[in-house]
């Protein structure tokens, strides 16, 4: 539906399979056979969200690149508005953030809010509370992100660090269309530690 609305835009769709154990790879192969605009990358095992983001960005070829989760918690219907903003308003990047956490467990909401408060208190790079990875970027920003050579990447911090002009769009949290999240509390904790160590000098000062 979104692609029909944006008829003047040539799309390429890149799906990244992060070592899934279900039928994801087969579905991606079928999509590729039916529509040459659909491409896919498949990891040999689960390397994590950051590796998937980097691989997808590196494989992209377009002048504009959107990052989006396939669970539809990132509403595709925002894409036309995001694209129009980049055409008219002089921004390099349209990012999104949730203004509610409807459907999310309270303990997870509390820990997420605490993380953002803590990391922003000790970091020179602002990481917006509720920020999603869902965004539309111009090619020059994509190239700058790819040139960041961190081994343990933290994209939410990198997007702010590279310094391009950003427009924020807000939306209410949307529950997953299917399946369950694979983000356990332990994985979230490890990801938070990577974010803190990657974008502040405080942990090094305390060591």
Predicted regions and their residues:
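Short, well-formed alpha-helical segments that are part of the catalytic scaffolds
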Residues: 1-4
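A conserved acidic beta->alpha catalytic loop
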Residues: 17-25, 72-73
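Ankyrin-repeat intra-repeat helix-capping/turn positions
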Residues: 67-69
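Conserved beta-strand segments of alpha/beta enzyme cores
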Residues: 12, 37-39, 165-167
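Acceptor/aglycone-binding surface of glycosyltransferases and processive sugar-polymer synthases
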Residues: 37, 41-45, 49-59, 64, ...
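Short, conserved SAM-binding/catalytic segment
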Residues: 30-35
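Short beta-strand/loop segment that forms part of the nucleotide-sugar
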Residues: 7-19, 41-42
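Alpha-helical bilayer-embedded segments of polytopic membrane proteins, i.e.
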Residues: 193-207
């Amino acid at each position: 539906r979104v692609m029909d609305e944006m008829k003047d835009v040539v799309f390429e769709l890149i799906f990244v399979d992060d070592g899934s154990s279900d039928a994801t790879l087969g579905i991606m192969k079928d999509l590729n056979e039916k529509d040459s605009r659909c491409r896919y990358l498949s990891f040999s095992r689960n390397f994590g969200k950051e590796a998937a983001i980097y691989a997808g960005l590196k494989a992209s070829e377009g002048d504009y690149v959107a990052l989006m989760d396939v669970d539809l918690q990132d509403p595709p219907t925002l894409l036309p508005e995001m694209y129009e903003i980049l055409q008219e308003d002089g921004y390099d990047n349209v990012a999104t953030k949730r203004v509610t956490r409807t459907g999310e467990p309270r303990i997870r909401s509390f820990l997420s809010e605490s993380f953002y408060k803590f990391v922003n208190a000790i970091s020179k790079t602002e990481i917006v509370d509720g920020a999603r990875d869902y965004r539309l970027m111009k090619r020059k920003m994509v190239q700058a992100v790819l040139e960041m050579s961190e081994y343990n990447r933290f994209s939410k911090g990198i997007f702010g660090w590279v310094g391009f002009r950003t427009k924020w769009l807000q939306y209410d949290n949307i529950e997953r269309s299917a399946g369950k999240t694979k983000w356990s509390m332990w994985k979230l904790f490890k990801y938070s530690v990577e974010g803190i160590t990657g974008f502040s000098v405080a942990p090094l000062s305390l060591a």
